[in-house]
Amino acid sequence: MFKDFFNRGSKKKKYVTVQDSKQNDVPTGIMTKCPKCKKIMYTKELSENLNVCFNCDHHLSLTAYKRIEAISDEGTFKEFDKGMTSANPLDFPGYEEKIKKDQEKTGLDEAVVTGTAELGGIEYGVAVMDARFRMGSMGSVVGEKICRIIDYCTEHRLPFILFSASGGARMQEGIISLMQMGKTSVSLKRHSDAGLLYISYITNPTTGGVSASFASVGDINLSEPKALIGFAGRRVIEQTINEKLPDDFQTAEFLLEHGQLDKVVHRKEMRSTLESILKMHAGQEVNKDA
């Protein structure tokens, strides 16, 4: 009897395992989850809203071609230097495989798309970096393509718009990558000396050698809301100076407050803002409602 009493509590309980609904995967390509508020949206509707979250207004990344489409008159974009790809000058192990993988994943040849287009009937040169490709890192091809489009704009007296999105210099190309900082800056100096307009449009994230070169030297520097902009990482800086940094440090709003940006522009106002600037520079009448 006592044996049965003690064994009574040792019997296994019957239960059913319920799967956590949070582990269910969202169908690939059909839905997109906002990385900030976690709201799930139809990818098509999100794309039509320029990848701006309907719920929290977070600006998700925008591909290079989608951004060009958003700021160009229909059918006016002409791409330059398509097909230019990186070599492996330092014989860095696995570099070619990583480049090929990113090409297959993104449909891009490199981390920047360049060319000319028109906005409001005004022709301009454009370069748009795409962080999906090697985190938008700047190697020899990125630097060369940017220099070529800047030099074209200088020769043909065109304004130039550059959208940056980058983790910095590409480590697999070593000093050749770092050289692109000076190389692109020289091309921009020639463009500036010719009295031409350069608009730097900084998007999330823009760090390292890109933030320390062409991204920061526009005649007009714009950015998207909450974009991460900086050189070294937050933790590195705090450990170096032994101080706690402000919570909004290295954000677009922080840089605007400290005079390093001219304006933080919502993506829905991107096209109208750029068109107004181009028209002012061309001496044309600007729509006051823009």
Curated annotation (Swiss-Prot):
Its main location: cytoplasm. A zinc finger (C4-type) spans 34-56. InterPro entries: AcCoA_carboxyl_beta, Acetyl_CoA_COase_Trfase_b_su, ClpP/crotonase-like_dom_sf, COA_CT_N, Znf-ACC. Keywords: ATP-binding, Cytoplasm, Fatty acid biosynthesis, Fatty acid metabolism, Lipid biosynthesis, Lipid metabolism, Metal-binding, Nucleotide-binding, Transferase, Zinc, Zinc-finger. The keyword Endoplasmic reticulum does not apply. GO terms for cellular component: acetyl-CoA carboxylase complex. Binds 1 zinc ion per subunit. Its EC number is 2.1.3.15. One of its GO terms (molecular function) is ATP binding. It catalyses: N(6)-carboxybiotinyl-L-lysyl-[protein] + acetyl-CoA = N(6)-biotinyl-L-lysyl-[protein] + malonyl-CoA. The keyword Nucleotide-binding applies. It is found in: Cytoplasm. Zn(2+) binds at C34, C37, C53, C56. It is an enzyme of class 2 (transferase). Residues 30-290 form the CoA carboxyltransferase N-terminal domain. One of its GO terms (biological process) is fatty acid biosynthetic process. Its cofactor is Zn(2+). Pathway: Lipid metabolism; malonyl-CoA biosynthesis; malonyl-CoA from acetyl-CoA: step 1/1. Component of the acetyl coenzyme A carboxylase (ACC) complex. Biotin carboxylase (BC) catalyzes the carboxylation of biotin on its carrier protein (BCCP) and then the CO(2) group is transferred by the transcarboxylase to acetyl-CoA to form malonyl-CoA. Acetyl-CoA carboxylase is a heterohexamer composed of biotin carboxyl carrier protein (AccB), biotin carboxylase (AccC) and two subunits each of ACCase subunit alpha (AccA) and ACCase subunit beta (AccD). Belongs to the AccD/PCCB family. This is Acetyl-coenzyme A carboxylase carboxyl transferase subunit beta. The gene is accD.
